[in-house]
Design a protein with these regions (language model features):
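Short helix/strand-bridging catalytic loops that position acidic/His residues to coordinate divalent metals
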Residues: 17-24, 57-61
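Low-complexity, acidic interaction segments enriched in glycine
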Residues: 42-152
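Membrane-proximal N-terminal amphipathic helix
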Residues: 21-49
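Long, contiguous hydrophobic alpha-helical segments, chiefly transmembrane helices and signal peptides
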Residues: 1, 17, 21, 29, ...
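N-terminal single-pass transmembrane signal-anchor helix
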Residues: 1-17
């Protein structure tokens, strides 16, 4: 009798514990995506502002031929001086957060993300390596709400 009650309770508790664990990783994924995307946006805004300020100071029509996005995720951590427009390298992240749904936990965090370049097509799964315009999860898993993590 006691054994059957324990097995029923275990059968109820285990699935809800797994659901809570998955929900926590989903929350972490959303937070990490937001952190990286905000850093990319801040980089772009800083680049545009420094170019505009440099034009005003020097009276030059300096042309920014690039997209204004970072070349790699590492640039967000290591810092960038924007071609000398900034007195010292500006950093946008302390570290690159990991994708909590990466399949291999030994993979470095910066390699756990899929990346899109500004010139890539929206549905492209191959990074053009021109710059980093966006990041996404490489996971093929399905979220609790039925969407794919890679589409977040």
């Amino acid at each position: 009798m006691t054994l059957s009650i324990l097995s029923i309770l275990a059968g109820l508790i285990l699935p809800s514990a797994q659901l809570v664990s998955k929900r926590n990783r989903e929350i972490e994924l959303k937070r990490n995506l937001r952190t990286i995307r905000n850093a990319i946006d801040d980089y772009k805004k800083t680049n545009e502002k420094l170019i505009e300020d440099n034009k005003k100071i020097q009276g030059l029509a300096k042309d920014d031929t690039g997209s204004g996005y970072p070349k790699t995720l590492d640039v967000l951590v290591e810092g960038h001086d924007f071609g000398g427009l900034s007195k010292e390298p500006k950093k946008f992240l302390r570290r690159i957060p990991c994708d909590p749904f990466r399949s291999d936990k030994t993979t470095p965090c910066k390699e756990s993300w899929g990346m899109k370049s500004y010139v890539d097509k929206p549905d492209s799964t191959m990074w053009g390596q021109e710059d980093v315009y966006d990041v996404y999860s490489k996971s093929e898993d399905t979220a609790i709400d039925g969407t794919k993590y890679k589409d977040w």
